[in-house]
Amino acid sequence: SKGNQQKVQIIATLVHEPDLVMLDEPFSGFDPINGALLNQVIERLKEHGATIVLSSHNMPAVEEICSSIALINHGRLLLSGPLREIKQRFRHHQYEVQTASPVDFSAAIAGGAIISAELMPRNNREPYSYLIQIPGESNSNRIVETVCGQSTLVSFKEKLPALSELFIRFANGEEQPMSIPEPDEAETFIKLN
């Protein structure tokens, strides 16, 4: 099977514990169990100081494994850098909020502290989940104040864009590729040691 072929190729690549590992679509053909095992192997390699170059269309796997990315489409560099910084740069100022009981956000919306509050579908025993949008860089504390005045806050986290969402936005031209400065002479070589 393709998964077994992939395993043999990966084992042959990693048996000598290389300092630099290049993996092209390593999750292709793997079931979830073998995909999880490969994640563990990659984590061990990283812990031992290996540099791993990963080429993949599996954006959730890339998000799980990589700390730094280069997003390339048709041979053109669209975006590169630390994944956490990239997600922060393209955030939508949205928050996922869970409460013990329903919350009325209408006063906060009317006051301009919140743009929208969408109640997400839920099962009977689950907390109430909302997707909250706030204006630009405004303070998210207003969300917490609104909730705590009416209910118990179960969870609160910022919803950052998924890497697959960013890829689609860039590939469709909704975002402009990052500008790459011309390298000076000192930057034109790559040192491998």
Name the predicted role of every residue range.
Residues S1-L54, M59-N73, L79:
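ABC transporter nucleotide-binding domains
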Residues Q9, D19, A50, Y95, ...:
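Generic structural signal for secondary-structure transition and capping sites
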Residues Q94-G173:
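Short, charged/small-residue-rich alpha-helical element at the C-terminal edge
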Residues H57-M59, L83, A100-P102:
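Histidine- and/or cysteine-centered catalytic micro-motif in compact active-site loops
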Residues R84-Q88:
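Short acidic-hydrophobic catalytic motif
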Residues F90-H92:
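Acidic, glycine-centered active-site loop in nucleotide-sugar glycosyltransferases
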Residues G173-N193:
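ABC-family P-loop ATPase nucleotide-binding domain
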